[in-house]
Regions:
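Ferredoxin-reductase
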Residues: 2-87
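Structural signal for conserved beta-strand scaffold positions within catalytic alpha/beta enzyme cores
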Residues: 11, 58, 159-161, 214, ...
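Short, surface-exposed secondary-structure boundary micro-motifs
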Residues: 45-46, 96, 235
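Local cysteine-cluster metal-coordination motifs and their immediate loop/turn environment
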Residues: 120, 195, 217-248
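FNR/FR-type flavoprotein reductase catalytic core
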Residues: 77-216
Length: 258
């Protein structure tokens, strides 16, 4: 159910190239949370700017005001406006939106995040109460974010960087292969990040027969299916929109060659 609320920014801090905000969201989480991996739609500015879809890093049911944490990078006029807001300011927020990851609290998952695709995976880590493993990828060690939270909320955390300045030197799919060779008993691989990363992770998961779900949230534009930027082709010939039909899809259904 779509809820619109005026949300107060109660905390704001810089995380590498990203900005983290904690919002007081009224009853939004209690009324509309379905699964980790959903997003919110934030009005950015008072003019003709579209609302911007922002993935939810974590959410908490609290009376009287639920708490939402969002982590985002400045990628245009809308997110630049959002980055200029301060603690105490109020945002017009719609949420929680989209279809998140299909998962059980009792499950054990291999969580894979790349770059700004890392924050949505924190909600998955919290949802399973420390039973899951996280593999996090960044361009370099100084770009790493949220690693301490994952270490507190996961059974194990593995890190990869493109330049080798932190953790494994290389891409996350190599660590996914390494982990599944050691233990292929995960209920599923859940991933969020750039499309090439998702494709490679899905391929490795398929080789080990482990189900894989991918969040294609990086491709969202307007968040309401109007701009068509987030069209995603399926193997059955269907064309779906990440913001309306996703952002999470079964990796086996995605046409990775489209």
């Amino acid at each position: 159910m779509k809820i619109e609320r005026k949300c107060k920014i109660v905390s704001k801090k810089q995380m590498g190239d990203a900005i983290c905000m904690v919002l007081e969201a009224g009853d939004m989480v209690r009324a509309s949370f379905r699964a980790p991996g959903q997003f919110v739609h934030i009005k950015c500015g008072d003019g003709q700017l579209l609302r911007r879809p922002i993935s939810v890093c974590s959410c908490q049911e609290v009376v009287p005001h639920d708490l939402l944490t969002i982590v985002f990078q400045v990628r245009g006029e809308g997110t630049a406006w959002l980055a200029g807001r301060c603690e105490g300011d109020t945002l017009d927020v719609m949420g929680l939106l989209g279809n998140g990851f299909k998962m059980e609290r009792e499950g054990r998952y291999l969580l894979v995040g790349g770059g700004i695709g890392v924050p949505p995976m924190r909600g998955c880590a919290q949802y399973t109460g420390g039973k899951s493993t996280a593999i996090l990828g960044f361009r370099s060690g100084d770009k790493a974010i949220l690693t301490g939270y994952f270490q507190d909320e996961c059974a194990k955390v593995l890190i990869a960087t493109d330049d080798g300045s932190l953790g494994h030197h290389g891409f996350v799919d190599a660590l996914v292969r390494q982990e599944l060779e050691r233990d292929s008993g995960y209920d599923a691989v859940l991933a969020c990040g750039p499309r090439p990363m998702l494709r490679n992770v899905a391929k490795v998961a398929g080789e080990f027969g482990v189900p894989c779900q991918v969040s294609m949230e990086e491709r969202m534009g307007c968040g309401i299916g109007a701009c068509l930027v987030c069209a995603c082709d399926m193997k059955d010939g269907a064309r779906k929109h990440v913001c309306k039909d996703g952002p999470v899809f079964d990796a086996r259904e995605v046409d990775w060659d489209a």
